[in-house]
Amino acid sequence: MWDGPLRSRQNLRTVAKLRSSGCPLTQSAIHPTTTSPSEGETASEILQGQASAGYIEEQQLPATSSQLEMSGDSNAASDNNVVIMTKRQRDDLSQASQAEVLSRLRTEDAQGPAENNGAQSDLALHSCDMEERVDSSKLNLNHVTVNKHSPPASKSAGISQQNDDGGCGASENVDNTTTAASKQRGKLLLDSSSSNCTPKQQAQQAVTQVPEWELSHEQERIFDIVVNHRRSVFLTGGAGTGKSHLLRAIIAALPLSTTFVTATTGLAALNLGGTTLHSFSGCGFVDQHTSTHQMVYRNVLGRKKARANWRKCRVLVVDEVSMLDAWFFDMLEYVARHIRGCRKPFGGIQLVLSGDFLQLPPVNKHSPKQETRLCFEAKSWPRVNPLVCTLSHQFRQKDKEFFSLLNEVRVGALTAPSLGLLSSLSVITTVSFVDEEKLKLKREVGAEAVDIITDSKGRTRRQRQDGFTILRARRSEVDAINTEKFGELDTEIYSYKGAHRGEGHFPSDLPSTVSVRAGCRVMLLANLDLSAGLANGSIGTVESFVSSKLHQTANPSTKDDLQHLADHMMLPVVRFDHKGKQGPGDGGGAAAGRLVVIEPHRWTMRQGDSDVSCSIQIPLQLAYAITIHKSQGMSLSHVNVDFAGIFEEGQAYVALSRCTDVANLVIENFDAQRVNPNIKALAYYRALEFVGTEHREAEKKLIDNGNKMNPWGPYDVEDFEASDDDNGGAVKKEVVENLTYDAENISCMVEQFRQRYMPQYIMFSTLRRRVLSNTEDAARVKGALLVMDTTSLLALTNMTGPTSLYQTIFTERGNMMRVPRVVKEELLFLASTDVKEVSSVTTPTLHSFCSTCSSTPCSTGFSYDFVEVVSCALSIMENAKCDFLLDEQREGEANSLPPVIQEWRSLSPLLMLNSSPDTGEKDAPSVIGFGERSREQHHSTLMFASFLVSRYSGNGAVYVCTETVELAARALAIGLRVCSIAYLCNRARRVN
């Protein structure tokens, strides 16, 4: 493709005149000193390539004559076919009201097309000219209602639609098809070379075809920032906050031809009607230990389609960015800059990133033990400087209680009622129980007729799993469940053994042997057709098999490939589950409910234009159970989760948040120790909270300045041209590597505070591990004095079967209950006060299981009355007093605290036992969430426990019984013993 300079206004006018007059477009006719374009290349293609690569300056882009009239400048440069609008005129035009713009559109439409409109429209509303369409910032696209009577827009010549891997090609030679999601996007920019409508009619049709979206106030604000102000953003928030809904609205409002929708997982890409990021970029799966940025760039440069994608792209959407490694992000930024020949961040591309760093981190397949770096740790992140937009409003009103619980699990700050609810949903399956009634029935009807083995709640395994999607942390557990369920069927089995040729071995993350039978549940392992809903992660049921000898296969290589996989020629026929659409813009789902023949799939490893290896297999695996990693991005109605195998940070949150209804959630072996958020992500979100004022000021400045700001913020980057030759050769002008950015931008500020918080988070992580390893089970303690705090009494109340647990700990084990004065005072206060004013935990702090009011459930929204729970705790205290098992603290029963023992002194800054902390960092407060009141309560409790140790240690042990990490750590630090009723010890171990 010819990439000669096309910079001046005169050149643009000349191109338009030549186009309208029918003269051939030669470079000599446009500019006497440049080389001729390739044969058959049109002015539209020239302008499109130049604008998408960042070569055409915004102030040189064309505008329609009517737009100039509205700008009010009679001195504007004009032409019979093309009128060039100056930057000042566009700024004036951007201030025109929505009513005025629409009024002029209707007026000109009623008057009919102007003479010679074909040549004028060709450049007036070109698909690559995003800034020069009718001012979308004033048309308020998200509120425009679809006009059912307006004719459909004609398919634009030269505009590539969604292709087979979800990307948008830049060449007419690419075989492109339109996805369902692509059809729903508003075609705001139309190339009119194949249209009989005037530019104004095209613009009006484009506006009326934008779907109507219902957005909240905070969603509208973010929508405006992305669509109208062209700012790169990072969209984040917890489950149920409307991230996907907002992304669909944004995608629908952006130009189809230059907006590329991607995700880090195939399923997430399906949900947005896009493609995987690896497929779009052309990078493939690369290893940072064996590949450099330059090597990847050269490979991408040799791929025509990927090269065209990067040059055509103006907006890049990336969902599930939490699974994007920092190295890969830096590599993408490097490739984008060099292919586009532009020093701007990502070569000037606007980024719309979405995800939650408190979900699963990136998977390091090559070095599993090596700590992965999250995306915000990338070197290029401060240059991109995305404006962080946090969604906090939840839209699942019926799931308000569950939403509150998920937010607490997300940040690892579980309150007493959340712990109680999770415990009530949990069953113990590490120990088998026998249903006595079913045992009698079994003796009567036969050994095989009745299942007598149950969990702790009397449910059999089949009752817990049938109809539920089983989520497990480890692949070995998933394989065992799938094998068992598969064996219950009696249909014929067809097996396929994977084949591999070329370098390396058959991929370890693919099943080497696939065995399926009619009636079994399966999951798709490849993105076969995103437009038809056939994405990696789609679940369905095998209904039958067809012979490839009789079946007309979609791929010519199917029969040959099948001969390498099996000694038969049968292909599975799968009916995939229906995926209900959630709103305009949803992609996929076309194949849901239909029978699909699954043919062998090829996974090819390429280096440049050469195939170095190829693996072939039927892209299916059994799906009765799936791994938690595989489930990220899914929405499941019935979920069974086992906490026993959870090992990864964020795994518990991802598993629980897959379920849409808490009533259909089964938890096996709940263990609060497994609720572990990533401390780097916690520090990042805490830093974001601390610079919230700066974020609000940045948003205000962005809106006040209109569209004058760059996608990466207010600072500017000196740009220069570079391009590749037609054969994908080297860049003509080397892109400077010493890249600069505003060192005081918001991303830099966030990173500075994150680094300042990290030592405290690391210290707390160490403290937490020590507490969990040294806390004893209260149900195993014998003949001791248990100093109870508020959380332990509430836990005793919330536990399933509190009466039996009370009997075990205090009657059978012979323990005595001792209650500090401050604990009883707090319980009485909570029982007699409506504490609705108390704010719930909304920030990612580390105050796990805190006993202060800020951690009590009054504001979490759970259905049961917390006052009743507190009253129940007081009732237990009265019963214990009547049983002579309880005694309360009396006046004078307190000793001063002993010094911190040697092994805990390194954690003294977090313990705050002897004096108020003074770190000298006034602008970076402690990450620990308990306040002064909590600290005073802990001190009073510990002083009472110290008194009991000095007085009764000869007659038995003294334990501090608590469910909070902070109090447990403070007690252990001064040499006291600690026990837990529920949450600081493994529940499963107590049932022995």
Swiss-Prot record:
Localization, UniProt: Mitochondrion matrix, Kinetoplast
One Gene Ontology term from the biological process aspect of the record: DNA recombination
Pfam families named in the record: Herpes_Helicase (PF02689), PIF1 (PF05970)
Function: DNA-dependent ATPase and 5'-3' DNA helicase required for the maintenance of mitochondrial (kinetoplast) genome stability.
Region (Disordered): 20-43, 145-182, 190-209
Family: Belongs to the helicase family. PIF1 subfamily.
Residue range(s) of DNA binding per entry: 651-670
Phylogenetic placement of the source organism: Eukaryota, Discoba, Euglenozoa, Kinetoplastea, Metakinetoplastina
Alphabetized CDD domains for the sequence: DEXSc_Pif1_like, SF1_C_RecD
GO cellular component: kinetoplast; mitochondrion; nuclear lumen
Protein's UniProt name: ATP-dependent DNA helicase PIF7
Catalytic activity: Couples ATP hydrolysis with the unwinding of duplex DNA at the replication fork by translocating in the 5'-3' direction. This creates two antiparallel DNA single strands (ssDNA). The leading ssDNA polymer is the template for DNA polymerase III holoenzyme which synthesizes a continuous strand; ATP + H2O = ADP + phosphate + H(+)
Annotated EC: 5.6.2.3
Traits of the deletion mutant: No growth phenotype.
Gene3D superfamilies registered for this protein in UniProt: P-loop containing nucleotide triphosphate hydrolases
Organism: Trypanosoma brucei brucei (strain 927/4 GUTat10.1)
